[in-house]
Amino acid sequence: MGGMQVQITNLTEWLADQGVRQDVLTTGIPGIPRTLQLRDRLTVHSVRFMTLPFKSSQTGTVFLDQSWFMGAVKWIVLNGKKNNYDAIHVHASGVVWPLLAGMFAQKYLKKPLILTIHCSRIFTYKPMNKWDQFVHDFVKSVELKSIKLSHKAVVLTDKRLDSYNRLLEDSSKMTAISDCIGSNHLSHSIDCPFCSRLKTELLGKKTVLFLGRIAHEKGWSTFVSVAKELADKIGDLQFIVCGDGPQREAMEEQIKAANLQNQFRITGFISHKFVSCYLHHAQLFLLPSHHEEFGGSLIEAAIAGVPIISTNNGGPADIFTHGETAILKDPGDVSGIADEAYKILTNDSVAESLRLHSRPEVVSKFLPHCVYPNYLNLYSSKEAAVHEG
């Protein structure tokens, strides 16, 4: 699962444990049951309308988002009015289809709409191709309309909240609730069997870690280019990519062109329970995203005590202080990022300073008990009360 999906999973499970009944509509994949009961009050429905056998460099499968939208609308029409829902919660990430589905559900079911904007199309998102650029203004207008129709709209940082407050005539419905750290990262033991195996495999070599979806917005091409510069300067390094995505083949081609095949490992998608293992065995976490609304993996890295380099746009600049709790550079600044990475990997005092300063700040703000009750308060508000049981 990607970072947003991990955050949604953790949130829905926590809410279910607090007594909130939920039906979650997701894409799913072929071979997985259409309905999964994850908790007594938490049911996940795979609602994809169809799966086409054509690859997409952006979404993985052609018409994946549209397929989910059609399936979600069908499910809402067939099942929505059978259940006495109190609210509709849509998680949006710069893609138009969840926004349209949320507006349809709000009109059809006549229930309050709660919108969480994991990536703002208006302020954060950067179009990835010519078609994306062509529809950019339209999707921004849909995002704005969704916010105006919503009962409450959630953004992930105070900075983004300020941006929307300046844009909207009525900003009273806007609020900021951050991502948070999964409980598995708080209780992880480096003596676990997988950590022991990983330690043996790494042979004591310094490791630079990339954690995320292999897609344009995560800056994987910058990561490989930085790896090339570091390998030329330091030599005996390993680069681990935890994740998969629609541009994996392109990444592998760039790695081959840089003659780095023997220093790279791409794990593919891994269970989130193993993410802590990789973080605890890395000497540097590098996430050079082109746009990043928050960056859940960044706070996970901070908890694990890994020095961090990311970009100074969106969430990373809101979470961290450059030079104190993380290093933040411009997107695509290969030489600048490589220079900072070299300092961290060759100077223990630089790495230790970043480690010591980042973890306390993250712990004070992004633990589950600091974050999730804010959503429960939204659900329990007078206009959108959710009944337990």
Swiss-Prot record:
<comment type="similarity">
    <text>Belongs to the glycosyltransferase group 1 family.</text>
</comment>
<dbReference type="GO" id="GO:0102319">
    <property type="term" value="F:2-deoxystreptamine N-acetyl-D-glucosaminyltransferase activity"/>
</dbReference>
<dbReference type="GO" id="GO:0017000">
    <property type="term" value="P:antibiotic biosynthetic process"/>
</dbReference>
<comment type="function">
    <text>Glycosyltransferase involved in the biosynthesis of butirosin by mediating conversion of 2-deoxystreptamine (2-DOS) to 2'-N-acetylparomamine using UDP-alpha-D-glucosamine as sugar donor.</text>
</comment>
<keyword id="KW-0328">Glycosyltransferase</keyword>
<dbReference type="InterPro" id="IPR050194">
    <property type="entry name" value="Glycosyltransferase_grp1"/>
</dbReference>
<dbReference type="Pfam" id="PF13439">
    <property type="entry name" value="Glyco_transf_4"/>
</dbReference>
<protein>
    <recommendedName>
        <fullName>2-deoxystreptamine N-acetyl-D-glucosaminyltransferase</fullName>
        <ecNumber>2.4.1.283</ecNumber>
    </recommendedName>
</protein>
<comment type="pathway">
    <text>Antibiotic biosynthesis; butirosin biosynthesis.</text>
</comment>
<dbReference type="Pfam" id="PF00534">
    <property type="entry name" value="Glycos_transf_1"/>
</dbReference>
<keyword id="KW-0808">Transferase</keyword>
<keyword id="KW-0045">Antibiotic biosynthesis</keyword>
<dbReference type="InterPro" id="IPR028098">
    <property type="entry name" value="Glyco_trans_4-like_N"/>
</dbReference>
<dbReference type="InterPro" id="IPR001296">
    <property type="entry name" value="Glyco_trans_1"/>
</dbReference>
